[in-house]
Curated annotation (Swiss-Prot):
GO BP term (any one): mitotic nuclear membrane biogenesis
O-(pantetheine 4'-phosphoryl)serine found at: 182
One GO MF term: magnesium ion binding
NCBIfam families with a match to the protein in the record: pantethn_trn
Gene: FAS2
EC number from the UniProt entry: 2.3.1.86, 1.1.1.100, 2.3.1.41
This protein's name: Fatty acid synthase subunit alpha
Induction (free text): Expression significantly elevated by the presence of glucose. Down-regulated by unsaturated fatty acids oleic acid and Tween 80. Up-regulated during in vitro biofilm formation and hypoxic conditions.
Binding site for Mg(2+): 1770-1772, 1870-1871
Gene Ontology cellular component annotations, sorted alphabetically: fatty acid synthase complex
Length: 1884
């Protein structure tokens, strides 16, 4: 054939082939087989723009024909027209000239360290690195090479995937690398298209190496649009200012000799190794380029050479510069510049030396000031200088006055302590609590007590009986004292010092109860009696006789003297020899008539009839028949007494005044002392001080007190708050302020604050009492060491105390209300020594007693000096505690802090106050200490004796121990040594505890069988990601205020502090926890101690941590501002494309020009152009609730590519979802499809804002032209989070609904989820909410004044964790937070079938809007509509609320349904006959009966469900008499009184907390909640902050945990509940957790901006279990237990292996089955190879529709046509037979039947089936009935050897059958989990 013809035929063939390919289906696989196998083609040529088919042919040859070709010795060539033209046309390459010999490159071994160094540099690009050395000479150039397509493709793909080059294999295709992410794939293909101009067909399926080969032939070797743009962005965003691409290229050329092509390659390599942040200097940039060049060299297989060290000297014409000439030139230039500067200065009239002159003057002034400061410090000292700094701030004042709330809280705490057996008897502490409650009694509190006491279930045990008895008595007490003033009455035990020395030589001190003095009443008597040391010194009888003798003898005669001498001698002998006269007594004492003792005996003390009597006597006011003053012994000074000034000017004991004081003390001890309407200032009342005890007494007596503290902190304010919460009486107020009594400014500011009007920021008080007890110790300072501290102490205790009194005097406005000042005097007038100026300070105060007379302030201040005796345990005296017992043995008295406070408070009685107004009063409270001579020596001896005894015993103990060890061995003490047992962690992950069925039935016995469980929605799983980790760890902190060991371990794991290791560690096998940083083992017992502080610091509400928010620092919040530039700017360099864009924007205000060396462009912005310049402002929202630092999705097992792809909020949602599933016992989500169709699993979770990080990227980062992923838009959608959950975990095809309800989103989600389940659209739904925290939202919330200002809070002395304070007086806005919360909800019926844990029942949910308005965030009360209920003039409640009534109606309806079902089954024979006539020969009776029976059963179930729904679930709906809330509770036989807790939205805003409290209160009131039964208010946001979308989900989780534990967590930040909330009697605001005896139901309310109100009510699952029969419940309990064990194992493995989250890589069905599964609602998975998958058999299965019971029944019915005429069909519901009724069973079943049924797998079904068989048999007999109540015991159903039922008739039944002609009865029984059916046939 001629060549021309061949060419024409070839052309025709090619055309036809192309036409065929375009017009017909592609059959390329078959085509390849034809030419490769049939024709053995060796040369295959593709004609086209790229080697698409050629590539496929190459892969086919490699995979299919490799061995085939080898066998036939075929050498195939696959060529492409566009790529292999030379091979196709056989065009040889021209011969190349031999290359010149090149220097040897460095060896690979030598370059390896350089590469390693470069890699190290790349990991820390931002670190400060020394700039590379400057080239000493020219570098040898490397032959240039254009960029290869392989490198370009590799870089573009790796950069898009955010991976290093070595993590992207070239052997994989793009489709494989993107892992199914179509968006990323499209981005890569788009970038390749831009870069190369065109792409081959299906490039995503081609391996990168092949794709590179296809591109290489047409690739020019220059960078395209995409790579140029990326490099330009790298240079502008990560290089230091001024370091442009031109600089980079020049550096690479000079440093390494790289040409333009290789420079491009290095810059491409840099794209995959971008620094984390902008490099700081040019040196850093060059170091970075060095690293990138080395990476490129390693990749390209070349060696980089450095500049030649001798290059500078090797040049022939190198110039040499004379250094002297250079220096002269530089000096001349500087001189010229200086002359020009001076000339310009003269012209501008500027003095160049002005600054220097001013500096000299400032320096001189500074020197003078420094000298003065040095002098001042030298005189006063450093301690004094620091000590006088003022600290007072009225902003930091804390006011406590919410006694009304704490009274109810304390009462409940005591109540539950009694019920739980913690308080079993009435001790002093209990009586004290009762007194405090009585002090706060009001009508509301009495109603509160009455409700709990009257409804106390005493049948529960003795503790409940005790609680009722004591409660009734306390109620009576409170009623008696209503309207009376509160009193301070201390009923504590009196204690004394006791010091012992143990056998081991330890000195042990304790406060021991005094048995002889048990009450303060007896204590006062003891004080009045004094002691041996306080007796007045009197002469003896002998001395009196001697004086008489001398006086008489002077006047007597001589004889008389002799006679008198004789009588005197005889008297002396009588006195000395008498046993009746004590010679040491005075004459007066010897002749005195003894008086009766007032000391109560032990018998008197124990004579009370019962504990109740002691409480009952509390309100009584006892009249004192014989005052204690009458018992003061003559010539004895009481331990406590009042002194008056004698004529000599000395202070001496005054019996009259002392009597007044002691009688007042006695009255205070017996009847109490009130301080109502008293305004008091107390300083020096720190913990453990006398002042603190005084303060406690003042507020318990109703005083209004301002107390100061010099150590202001959260710990200190909590101390005072706790004191007030416990002791604050009605009408009392406690105000705490920071105050330094050493500062004059603070003294003035404090008094100004007290007296200023409230409008001026003050209190507007007028002080009645001043108790200035502030002091600091000066131990160890003698007169030779009076230092700075001593002087400062003197200033506090004297100077500024006087200033304080003077300031009060100056502000006193009336002379009729003087302030009583209790001066803290001391008996220590240098007695102890070495106490600095302490004694001098105290003595100097005594001058005020004289100045009261001599100065003009006597009508405004009164003086009462209190000489304070030895008080044990105070800061000043605690070191002397051990010798106090020895001191008391001398006959004096030391005091406890309570005793001394009682003594001082006794000075505030009206009688003493009146005395003070007449004259200054000196009260000696020294206990007789002043009568001890040489006190210092005696105390020293006591101390030395104790120390010596201790030393001796210690030495003896040591010696004995040594001897024992020598004799008995070293381990002799092992059995006696104290061992501290530290338990190991036990992480349980428990499911809710299930009670026994009998306990369940006691809860609600009438609920069994009442509800349609498919219309009951339950929570089976819940979880969260929040500031406190997860739901478990958050609950520990919320309920207990601290982490358990297990909680600490979990938090440490979450925060990346520890990880689990199983393998070799440092060469040894180790399994356990290790520190994540040091890789060292950590014992689980030590984790809490080691990491807890760091955990607490970096979790919860805290200062914003910039590393969590991409560097966002609110202290430097960045914003931009537009400015017009005033002069031309310096030019800068960028790419051509970017330069043109600048020109396009700025027009003639911008000049651009090309830079010839690099091809880059120079840009110059001209005057008049507008620029946006960044600025930073100090933003005051510095605090937020943040995810724990170190939280990482990788810890849970989420893949890296997913983390890089999605918004951070999506990660929170994924983790919360998988934890929620595990909480539900679901370890594989595909298990759902074993029970439900894929269309029945939905997701209704939502968010307020969605992916805010993605939104930020879309708007802010994109606007700033920062790198942003191209598919960022999809991550911003609110429904994307749900989409990821489905794509990675569920693979469901059910409803997806995405609520957006601002802060109410989560509860709205629950509402939608419930509706979705109840409507039948789904059976399992994921609900919840989620939101992130970002600076944009934070700023806008601040602009709305919705959030609290951290700066303002800091000024008020608040710590970050205190800044969210719902319900408090000082609440000031909500605190933002971030996180997610998810619940798994499903129908109760499904939950029971699956055996998943049921955490709570969702009894009700609702949403509501509010009224007309103009404010979107304004709070409203629309949600009150859940309590909508018409009352009108209706007198009687609806019978529908009575469960017994509803049960009766349901029973009737079920009987009707059973009758209908039986009749339908009976009619089936006739129906089959008619159908046979209709369908003819094709008719199958068996199939017809099966299908129709199934339909009847299904219809019966539907009718039963509707009946239960009508009378159980939905009876209240649309009934105006029954509120939705009331009806939802009544469904479970609960009332409005059974809502135990209301979880408040509680945002800590003024408006919300009041509005929400009013709403809940109105709701309870309208629905008739009992008075005195407030709900516990839970305000979770004090702990977590406000996460917006997740808020309701976290609250719901907390509500579930409340139901499970019975613990009601308190609002620990509620330091003082707002007075305005007192009006809401139906809400209690606890500040601490209270363990109750069970919570039945919890209400959760949520409110969102945009008129969103929502409420959900959860009920304890016990009320659901009460609906079940015993068999169903016990079967469920078994399956839950098994699931719990499985989940327990999974959770432990998940934590130790970081595999909690396991992403699904495929759906549970193959692609081929997708549509089949979708279209078959009965398709279910089966478990194959440990996986749940759909199979062909499971889709459209013949067995999936007709149930076993229908088959069995149909089979029995089909035999009716062939059998006898007596037929009986009976249907019984399993739920209707009460097998717990023993009487019923014994009456209707034989013992054998009972035994058989009880031993069956399902006793409920077995009994029901047997009963149905009995009924069917009776019907088959056709005999007359004996009535509905007749026993069926005579019809016995027995089982044969095969288990088949047989009928045995006995007695009357047998006789009736015989009379009817019945010979035998055959019966068939079938049942499922819903009903049992029996068909009986009689044989005649």
């Amino acid at each position: 054939m001629k060549p021309e013809i061949e060419q024409e035929l070839s052309h025709t063939l090619l055309t036809e082939l192309l036409a065929y390919q375009f017009a017909s289906p592609v059959r390329w696989i078959e085509t390849q087989d034809v030419f490769l196998k049939q024709h053995n083609t060796e040369r295959v040529i593709e004609i086209g723009p790229s080697p698409t088919l050629a590539g496929m042919a190459s892969r086919t040859i490699k995979a299919k024909y490799q061995s085939y070709d080898a066998a036939l010795s075929l050498q195939r060539q696959v060529l492409c027209y566009s790529k292999d033209a030379k091979e196709i046309y056989y065009t040889p390459d021209p011969a190349e000239p031999p290359a010149a010999e090149e220097p040897k490159a460095e060896t690979g071994k030598e370059s390896a360290p350089a590469a390693s160094a470069a890699a190290a540099a790349a990991t820390q690009p931002a670190a400060a690195v020394a700039p590379p050395p400057q080239s000493a000479g020219p570098v040898e150039s490397i032959p240039d090479e254009p960029v290869k397509a392989s490198l370009l493709i590799h870089v573009l793909v790796a950069q898009k995937l955010k991976k290093p080059l070595d993590a992207v294999p070239m052997s994989k295709a793009i489709k494989d690398l993107v892992n199914g992410k179509s968006t990323v794939q499209n981005e890569i293909l788009g970038d390749l298209g831009k870069e190369f101009g065109s792409t081959p067909e299906k490039p995503e399926e081609t391996p990168l190496e092949e794709l590179a080969e296809q591109f290489q032939d047409t690739f020019s070797g220059s960078l395209g649009k995409t790579s140029t743009s990326l490099i330009g962005r790298l240079m502008s965003s990560k290089m230091p200012g001024g370091f442009s691409i031109t600089n980079a290229r020049k550096y690479l050329e000079s440093r390494f000799g790289l040409g333009p092509g290789r420079q491009d390659s290095v810059l491409l390599t840099a794209l995959c190794n971008e620094p984390a942040s902008r490099l700081g200097s040019e040196g850093d940039a060059k170091s970075f380029l060095d690293t990138m060049a080395q990476k490129y060299a390693s990749h390209a297989g070349i060696s980089l050479s450095s500049p030649s060290a001798g290059g500078a000297s090797s040049g022939a014409g190198a110039a040499v510069v004379d250094s002297a000439a250079l220096d002269a030139l530089i000096a001349e230039n500087k001189k010229l510049a200086r002359q020009q500067l001076e000339t310009l200065a003269r012209y501008l009239q500027v003095d160049l030396t002005k600054g220097e002159k001013a500096f000299i003057k400032e320096k001189e002034a500074t020197t003078v000031l420094q000298q003065e400061l040095d002098l001042w410090e030298a005189e006063h000292g450093e301690f004094y200088a620091k000590g006088i700094k003022p600290v007072f701030s009225p902003l930091k004042s804390r006011t406590y006055d919410s006694y009304w709330n704490w009274a109810r809280q304390d009462l409940l705490s005591m109540w539950f302590d009694i019920l739980f057996g913690k308080l079993t008897s009435v001790d002093r502490e209990t009586i004290n609590q009762c007194i405090q409650i009585m002090n706060r009694a009001n009508p509301t509190l009495i109603k509160f007590m009455q409700y709990h006491v009257e409804l106390c279930p005493t049948y529960r045990g003795e503790t409940y009986k005790l609680g009722k008895r004591l409660g009734e008595q306390l109620i009576e007490n409170c009623k008696q004292i209503l309207g009376q003033s509160p009193v301070y009455k201390d009923v504590s035990r009196i204690t004394g010092p006791k010091t012992t020395v143990s056998a081991k030589g330890d000195i042990v001190y304790e406060e021991a109860n005094k048995e002889s003095v048990r009450k303060f009443e007896q204590y006062v008597f003891e004080m009045a009696q004094g002691g041996s040391m306080t007796k007045m010194k009197q002469s003896s009888i002998q001395e009196d006789l001697a004086r008489v003798y001398k006086a008489i003898s002077k006047q007597a005669s001589r004889d008389s003297k002799l006679e008198l001498q004789k009588v005197y001698d005889q008297l002396l002998k009588v006195v000395e020899g008498s046993t009746e006269i004590e010679t040491e007594q005075t004459t007066q004492d010897a002749l005195a008539i003894p008086t009766g003792s007032n000391t109560p005996t032990e018998e008197d003390e124990l004579s009370t009839a019962s504990d109740d009597d002691e409480i009952a006597s509390l309100p009584d006011k006892t009249s004192i028949a014989q005052p204690v003053s009458s018992t003061i012994p003559n010539k004895t000074i009481p331990f406590l007494h009042i002194q008056s000034k004698s004529e000599s000017g000395n202070w001496e004991y005054d019996r009259k005044l002392s009597s007044i004081y002691l009688d007042g003390l006695e009255s205070a001890a017996i009847n109490g002392l009130t301080f109502k309407d008293k305004y008091v200032l107390v300083t020096g009342a720190g913990a453990g001080s006398i002042g603190a005890e005084i303060l406690q007494g003042l507020i318990s007596g109703g005083a209004k007190v301002i107390v100061t503290t010099s150590r202001y902190s959260k710990k200190v304010t909590e101390y005072y708050q706790n004191m007030y919460a416990r002791y604050g009486a009605a009408g009392s107020t406690l105000i705490v302020v920071p105050f330094n009594q050493g500062s004059k400014q603070d003294v003035d500011a404090l008094v100004e604050y007290i007296y200023n009007d409230q409008k001026k920021g003050g209190l507007g008080w007028d002080l009645d009492v001043i108790i200035p007890f502030a002091a600091i110790p000066e131990n160890g300072n003698g007169i030779d060491n009076i230092d700075s501290k001593s002087e400062f102490a003197h200033r506090i205790m004297l100077t500024n105390l006087l200033r304080l009194l003077g300031a009060v005097k100056a502000r006193k406005t009336t002379d009729t209300r003087p302030a009583q000042c209790i001066l803290p005097l001391s008996p220590n007038h240098g007695t102890f020594g070495f106490d600095g100026l302490y004694s001098e300070s105290k003595i100097s105060l005594e001058t005020l007693f004289n100045r009261w007379y001599s100065e003009d302030w006597g009508t405004k201040l009164t003086i009462c000096g209190a000489i304070i005796g030895w008080t044990r345990g105070t800061g000043l005296m605690s070191a002397n505690n051990i010798i106090a017992e020895g001191i008391e043995k001398l006959g004096v008295r030391t005091f406890s802090q309570k005793e001394m406070a009682f003594n001082i408070l006794g000075l505030l009685t009206p009688e003493i106050v009146n005395l003070c107004q007449e004259e200054p009063v000196m009260a000696d409270l020294n206990g007789g200490l002043q009568f001890i001579d040489n006190l210092k020596e005696f105390t020293s001896k006591l101390r030395n004796d104790l120390t010596e005894t201790a030393d001796i015993r210690r030495a003896v103990s040591i010696e004995s121990a040594i001897e024992q060890k020598v004799v008995n061995g070293d381990n002799v003490d092992s059995n006696y040594n104290k061992v501290t047992v530290r338990p190991r962690a036990n992480m349980k992950f428990d499911f809710p505890t299930l009670k026994s069925y009998d306990e369940i039935k006691q809860i609600a016995p009438d609920l069994e069988g009442m509800l349609d469980l498919e219309n009951v929605v339950v929570v089976t799983g819940f979880a969260e990601v929040g500031p406190w980790g997860n739901a478990r760890t958050r609950w520990e902190m919320e309920s207990k205020g601290e982490f358990s060991l297990e909680g600490a371990i979990e938090m440490a794991w979450i925060m990346g502090m520890i990880k689990y290791h199983n393998g070799n560690l440092k060469g040894k096998p180790y399994s356990g926890w290790i520190d994540a940083k040091t890789q060292t083992p950590v014992d689980d017992k030590d984790i809490k101690a080691k990491y807890e502080e760091e955990i607490l610091e970096h979790s919860g509400i805290r200062l914003i941590e910039p590393e969590l928010f991409n560097g966002y620092d609110p202290k430097k919040k960045q914003m931009i501002q537009e400015v017009v530039i005033q002069h031309d700017l310096e030019p800068f360099e960028c790419s051509k494309e970017t330069a043109e864009q600048y020109k396009h924007e700025h027009g003639d205000k911008c000049e651009i020009s090309e830079i010839e060396e690099s091809g880059e462009y120079s840009v110059r912005i001209l005057k008049g152009a507008t620029l946006f310049i960044p600025k930073a402002l100090r933003f005051d929202r510095l605090v937020a609730g943040q995810i724990p630092t170190g939280w990482d999705a990788r810890t849970y097992g989420i893949p890296e590519d997913t983390i890089n792809q999605v918004d951070p909020i999506t990660l929170y949602v994924l983790v919360a979802t998988v934890e929620a599933l595990l909480s539900a016992g679901i370890t594989d989500p595909y298990e759902f499809y074993k029970y439900v169709h894929v269309s029945e699993v939905g997701n209704c979770s939502g968010s307020g804002m969605g992916g805010v990080s993605a939104l930020r990227g879309m708007f802010k980062d994109r606007y700033a032209d920062k790198p942003v992923q191209n598919d960022i838009l999809q991550e911003s959608f609110i429904n994307t989070m749900s989409a990821w959950v489905n794509m990675l975990l569920l693979s469901a095809s059910g409803p997806i609904k995405t609520p957006v309800g601002a802060c109410a989103t989560a509860v709205e989600s629950v509402d939608i989820g419930i509706e979705t389940i109840l409507s039948g659209k789904a059976k399992v739904v994921m609900v919840g909410g989620y939101d992130d925290f970002q600076e944009e939202g934070s700023y806008e919330f601040a602009n709305m004044n919705a959030t609290s200002s951290a700066i303002d809070e800091f000024k008020h002395g608040r710590t970050p964790k205190e800044m969210s304070r719902p319900t408090t007086t000082t609440r000031n806005g909500f605190m933002e937070a971030q996180g997610s919360g998810i619940q798994v909800i499903m129908s109760a019926d499904l939950a029971l079938k699956m055996g998943v844990p049921i955490h709570a029942v969702l009894a009700m949910s609702a949403t509501a809007t509010d009224k007309i308005g103009r404010s979107v965030p304004a709070p409203g009360k629309g949600i009150l509509t859940t309590a909508r209920e018409h009352h009108g003039n209706l007198k009687y409640p609806s019978p529908l609320l009575n469960v017994k009534y509803r049960k009766r109606q349901l029973s009737k309806r079920l009987d009707q349904i059973k009758s209908w079902e039986s009749s339908e089954l009976n009619y089936l024979q006739e129906e089959a006959h008619l159908a046979k006539e209709e369908f003819g020969e094709e008719f199958s009776e068996a199939e017809f009966l099966r299908e129709r029976t199934e339909e009847i059963y299904r219809e019966s179930k539907r009718q039963v469900a509707d009946a239960k729904k009508q009378w159980g679930n939905a009876f209240y709906k649309s009934d105006p008499r029954i509120a939705p809330l009331r009806g939802a509770l009544a469904t479970f036989n609960l009332t409005i009184d059974d809502i135990g807790v209301a979880s408040f939205h509680g945002t800590s805003t003024v408006a919300n907390d009041k509005n929400e409290s009013a709403t809940i209160d109105s709701m309870m009131k309208h629905l008739g909640r009992s008075e005195g039964n407030p709900v516990f208010g839970v305000f979770q946001k004090y702990l977590t902050g406000h996460p917006k979308g997740a808020a309701g989900a976290w609250m719901l989780n907390g509500a579930i945990q409340i139901l499970e534990s019975g613990i009601v967590p308190g609002n620990r930040n509620a330091d003082n509940v707002d007075k305005v909330l007192e009006q809401y009697e139906y809400v209690l605001y606890p500040s601490r957790s209270i363990q109750t005896d069970g919570i039945k139901a919890v209400s959760v309310t949520s409110f969102g901006f945009g008129q969103k109100g929502a409420q959900a009510v959860v009920v304890h699952p016990d009320y659901l279990y009460a609906v079940l029969d015993r068999s169903t419940y016990e079967d469920y309990a078994k399956r839950v237990t098994a699931r719990n064990k499985k989940t327990y194992r999974y959770m432990h493995n998940a934590i130790t292996r970081n595999t909690m989250f396991v992403a699904k890589d495929k759906a549970p069905y193959s692609d081929e089955l997708t549509m089949d599964v979708y279209l078959d609602p009965l398709a279910r998975v089966s478990k194959t190879k440990n996986e749940f998958v759909f199979t062909k058999k499971s889709v459209q299965s013949d067995k999936s529709y007709v149930s076993n019971i229908a088959n069995s029944t149909a089979k029995a019915l089909s035999s009716l046509n062939k059998s006898s005429k007596g037929v009986g069909v009976d249907v019984e519901l399993l739920s209707e037979l009460n097998i717990d009724n023993e009487t019923f069973l014994e009456r209707n079943f034989t013992p054998e039947e009972i035994k058989y049924c009880q031993n069956s797998a399902n006793p409920q079904a077995s009994f029901t089936g047997t009963w149905s068989a009995k009924e069917a048999t009776f019907k088959a007999l056709g005999v007359s009935s004996q009535g509905g109540g007749a026993s069926l015991k005579e019809i016995e159903i027995v089982r044969d050897g095969n288990g088949a039922p047989q009928v045995v008739l006995n007695d009357n039944a047998k006789a009736a059958a015989k009379a009817a002609g019945v010979k035998n009865v055959n019966v068939s029984i079938s049942h499922d989990d819903f009903q049992a059916t029996a068909v009986a046939l009689s044989e005649f």
